[in-house]
Amino acid sequence: MALLQIAEPGQSASPHQHKLAVGIDLGTTNSLIATVRSGQVDILLDEKERPLLPSVVHFEQDNVIVGYEAAELASQSPQNTIVSVKRLIGRSLADVQQRYPSLPYQFEASENGLPLIRTSKGTLSPVEISAEILKKLTALAEKRLAGELSGAVITVPAYFDDAQRQSTKDAAKLAGINVLRLLNEPTAAAIAYGLDSGQEGVIAVYDLGGGTFDISILRLSKGVFEVLATGGDTALGGDDFDHQLMDWIVAQSGIAPQNAQQQRQLTELATQIKIALTDKLETSISYQGWQGNISREQFNQLIQGLVKRSLLACRRALKDADVSADEVCEVVMVGGSTRVPFVREQVAAFFQKEPLTSIDPDKVVALGAGIQADILVGNKPDADMLLLDVIPLSLGIETMGGLVEKIIPRNTTIPVARAQEFTTFKDGQTAMSVHVVQGEREMVADCRSLARFSLRGIPAMAAGAAHVRVTYQVDADGLLSVTAMEKSTGVQSSIQVKPSYGLSDDEITNMLKASMLNAKEDIQARLLAEQRVEAQRVLESVGSALSADQDLLNDEELSAVKNAIISLQRLQKEGDTQEIKQGIKQLDLATQEFASRRMDKSIRQALAGKAIDDVMKNAK
């Protein structure tokens, strides 16, 4: 709940003073900004009463142009006009060039391998370019609202990874924005529809924008928005529809673009055709002297594979949520690309119900963000609403033998913090390496490495005596922090996980499929690895004991122990799970008398020089 302000006597506390906060939908194609005024959320319009701001930035030597004017300059100066920068943010240059080989920009790599774009204004990063869009939006808001903003909620695709989310925050910081929270776009849409219609039950949020696709399965119950599962593709959207049209036009006309300017003109033509076919069954095309026609049915055939990709992600999300399509009460359509009739038809057929389109799909995310910003800034009590997002893949830690110990399972609601204790493996161990991994498999080699760090300064003790508490914390923005602390000394080390680039939906799906297909083999591999680790622990323990007290054994006994050691060493490398288990048992039998004598020796040393009465008193 919002905190009341307490003022000095004689001064007004102004407990109900309205703070200015906005929700920003930082989109791939267009961006919007919304706020709550007089209890109603609405989109802030620009000076020409337009709700959308094209996410396009044009750079000149002494000037930066954002929005419609920048978009008009795209054909004339494609290398200085950055379109769909959201696709680049938080990715490595290698990833960008692999995913988008036909971009007209002049790239170079930063020191850490991130993309930089050469423009007339200098070399700029996607973060700096995104900041220009955010500056334009906040300037518009402060002019319209006649005041300074207290903060903003900025939306991001549900599948943005830590690096992409952090880069979005960095862009906001450059733009001088106080980020109240990063909010998943489907969750923002759920806020908008949940408040407006008061729905309860399972809802699917189908979000197809210019550059990204997200599907979220949510349960709405008594004001609680719980995300049961998420899916999607960070490289699927309306831009891809345009590319299909562009390829078709080139194939039909036999005229390929010869330079960046012609490429940009072709892109603009494809977008115009797509929009025209939303309302018309057929439209004409004029391209570099070539005249032609294309029907909506032909367009549907071109994009059929892309729409099918989105529906496959829907099917996987339903399976993850453990619900069937007929359990979904409502389907919320988000993103400008859901205006395409074929998309609406296919989604309706898949879920067997007409999707909700009562809120403008271009505006719904910004409206939800605006509502959330109003709550977070303290203008509205939030006791009647709770948001629970989830993580898409399990987060774990590497343990001895290359095994994965899962700390936070997949589809756990966030924010969340989980902790687990680990012990040292060797005598005198003073450091521990922490390897953070992501995935569903049992072995580290089959999972995705996120980060590594070391905890040093652990007191030298016997193996297993030092206790290290490892805490995984995922905040409301989906950023992961890992802390390791040795309990007796309090010495600790931590890291914030920021992968250099993220996972696509296909990669996540492949990881999940692999975990199911290899479940039996993975368990067998884990059991074998665990026995090998246990064998190593026993061998080191016996070796340490022999170094200290070998004189307690006669030659025959020592020979038997050494033979059992040699046998276990061989089995550890070559044997199966049961053979190693049997080898450990044989070594245990061979050392039982040795262990008994060591215990007797230890007791004698402890009692040396002490009277019986003193020992009995201490025992009491």
UniProtKB/Swiss-Prot annotation:
Q: Which GO terms describe its molecular function?
A: ATP binding; ATP hydrolysis activity; ATP-dependent protein folding chaperone; unfolded protein binding
Which BP terms from GO are recorded? iron-sulfur cluster assembly
Q: Which UniProt keywords apply?
A: ATP-binding, Chaperone, Nucleotide-binding
**Matching InterPro entries:** ATPase_NBD, Heat_shock_70_CS, HscA_NBD, HSP70_C_sf, HSP70_peptide-bd_sf, Hsp_70_fam, ISC_FeS_clus_asmbl_HscA
The reply to whether Secreted figures as a keyword in the UniProt entry is no
Q: Which Pfam families match?
A: HSP70
Q: What does this protein do?
A: Chaperone involved in the maturation of iron-sulfur cluster-containing proteins. Has a low intrinsic ATPase activity which is markedly stimulated by HscB.
NCBIfam families in alphabetical order: HscA, PRK05183.1
- Database matches in PANTHER family: HEAT SHOCK PROTEIN 70KDA
In the record, the note on similarity to other proteins reads:
Belongs to the heat shock protein 70 family.
Q: What is this protein called?
A: Chaperone protein HscA homolog
Q: Which organism is it from?
A: Pasteurella multocida (strain Pm70)
> Taxonomically, what lineage is the organism?
Bacteria, Pseudomonadati, Pseudomonadota, Gammaproteobacteria, Pasteurellales
